[in-house]
Amino acid sequence: MDSRTGESITVAQAENSVFIWEVPNPLYFRIQRVEDPLYTRTRIYHIQVRFNHNLRKALDLRKAYFNFQVWTTSMRASGPTYLSRFKCLVMSHLDNLGVIGINHVIRAVRFATDRSYVTHVHENHVINFKIY
C-alpha cells in the first residue's frame, strides 16, 4: 500500500524492475537495533533496507523503506556480523536474478531468512510512489 495516498500497489508497480547492473549500489542496509529478550535463547535483529536514489528514480518511487524484524536462535552473531551475512545473501540472490524491484527485494529477504536458526520474520514497509 502506498503510505502517502493509501492506495493499493498494483501488480505492475510491484513487479516493475530494473537491471541490477544499471544501478550502482542499489540497496542500503542498516541495522537499527538488536534485542536480547530476558530468559530466552532468542535474538531479534531490526534491519532496514532502503532503495538508493538511483533505484528510486528508475522505479518512479519517492520513498521505499523495508523494515524487518528477524527473530533468531543464533546468539553468536553480533549486529554487524549478522547484517553483513544478511546483506551478502540478499545481494547474491538479486545478482542471480539480474533484476531488482519491490517484489524481488522481498523474495531475496525471504531467501536470506530461510535458515534453520531463523524462527520468525516480521515485515513493515513505507513505500511512496511519485504521483506527478
Curated annotation (Swiss-Prot):
Disulfide bonds: none annotated. Belongs to the geminiviridae replication enhancer protein family. The keyword Membrane does not apply. The lineage of its organism: Viruses, Monodnaviria, Shotokuvirae, Cressdnaviricota, Repensiviricetes. Increases viral DNA accumulation. Enhances infectivity and symptom expression. This is Replication enhancer protein. Keywords: Host-virus interaction. GO terms for biological process: viral process. It holds the Pfam family Gemini_AL3. Homooligomer. Interacts with the replication-associated protein (REP). Interacts with host proliferating cell nuclear antigen (PCNA). Interacts with host retinoblastoma-related protein 1 (RBR1), and may thereby deregulate the host cell cycle. Oligomerization and interaction with PCNA are necessary for optimal replication enhancement. The keyword Iron does not apply. InterPro entries: Gemini_AL3 (IPR000657).
